[in-house]
Amino acid sequence: QNSNWFPIAAINYVADLLEMPRIRAYEVATFYTMYNLAPVGENLIQICTTTPCALRGSKDIVDVCKKRLNINFGETTSDNKFTLLEVECLGACVNAPVAWIGDEYYEDLSKESMDSIIDQLKKGDLKLSPGSQIGRNGSMPMGQRNSLLDEGK
């Protein structure tokens, strides 16, 4: 409703409305990564870099974003099209590495899939479906049994 961010005045308003100390509302607003306290770009890319994602290659995903967008974490492109943020666990560890773009999770990312996502976002036409980028259904194991009777791949 406010281009993915809200000002301190909004936090104060909510705290006053709920008759709670303003610091309590501020604590909530600064704890969760879905709340931004400063303007962000049209395309907000948040990349998880905690241990499971790091072990599965999130550094490569970060490198692609930084190189393609020519920005670092916490920065917005000069045309205000992209903001890149580093975030803590997004809760999709089994499908790591994960990026949260807009309102969707993109999972099982590779350098190539992230590069394609950025290309599509730059054109304003994101065609890739959210979720696993390698065709996994939910969090099923890769190449292993999916049930007791399954032979695996």
Model-found features: residue ranges?
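Signature of N-terminal electron-transfer/Fe-S-associated modules in redox systems
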Residues: Q1-K153
